[in-house]
Amino acid sequence: MKFSNKIKISWHDTDAFRCVRPSKIVEYMQETANLQCVDSGLPLDDLRDEKGLAFILGAMSISIYKPLHAYEEVEVRTWCRETKSYIFNRYFDIVRGGEVIAEAASTWVLIDLDKKSMVRADNYDFFGGKFYYDEPVAADSVPKKVRIGKDAELNFVGERKIAYSDVDYNMHMNNTHYPDMVCDFLSELADEKNPCRVKELSLSFIKESHLGATLKVSRSEMDGDGNILVRTQNEEGETCLEAMICLEAL
């Protein structure tokens, strides 16, 4: 079965064209995952404070089949499969009126915060057997790994400083904020003459973006299929994020 969380969408979650922003969709999904941990008996704060461990997101792919709007009531669901490696695979969907209108797949690793090392996921059963649900998953249900080649034609479009409102207790940008940051550099999403929305979004998290860091943001031109590539790099020139966004007309 899937763990379920019912929500009513806030007006403040929507963009210039009255569609829910991708960052809010990711937030709905990840808050539902957090609630599953609470329901299973070990909130993420306790996992960190009592066991010195934290989940770190490696990659996430989201498909938004239809736009969401203010005050709609939806059901957000999440599930994961038991793992025999270092990787946790977690899945999500959002249901409106009995119809699945968004889906996502994500990969996570468990980190020992003191040792700064990965922990095998199958070494622990923190959640008393309640964490894993026997839900079928398609063989290809894995997040798309975004890898932008060195020969990709990207143009520098601006800088973004990581500030107070971006970070969580890990002191780096919370991963639910990345879609907003990426979309802030897509002028297409603010074109009143040609309204559009994000249909798909794939994020590969390569290096954390810490409080106070200034990221350089580069992007490609939109191709014929509506795809745009985005890369962020820190002051040392290290790549922090690579993303692919697909837009469609409204």
Each language-model region and where it sits:
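Hot-dog-fold acyl-thioester-processing enzymes
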Residues: 1-57, 105, 112-197
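Small beta-barrel nucleic-acid-binding modules, principally OB-folds
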Residues: 53-67, 196-208
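HotDog/MaoC-like acyl-thioester-processing domains
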Residues: 2-5, 63-143, 205, 209-214, ...
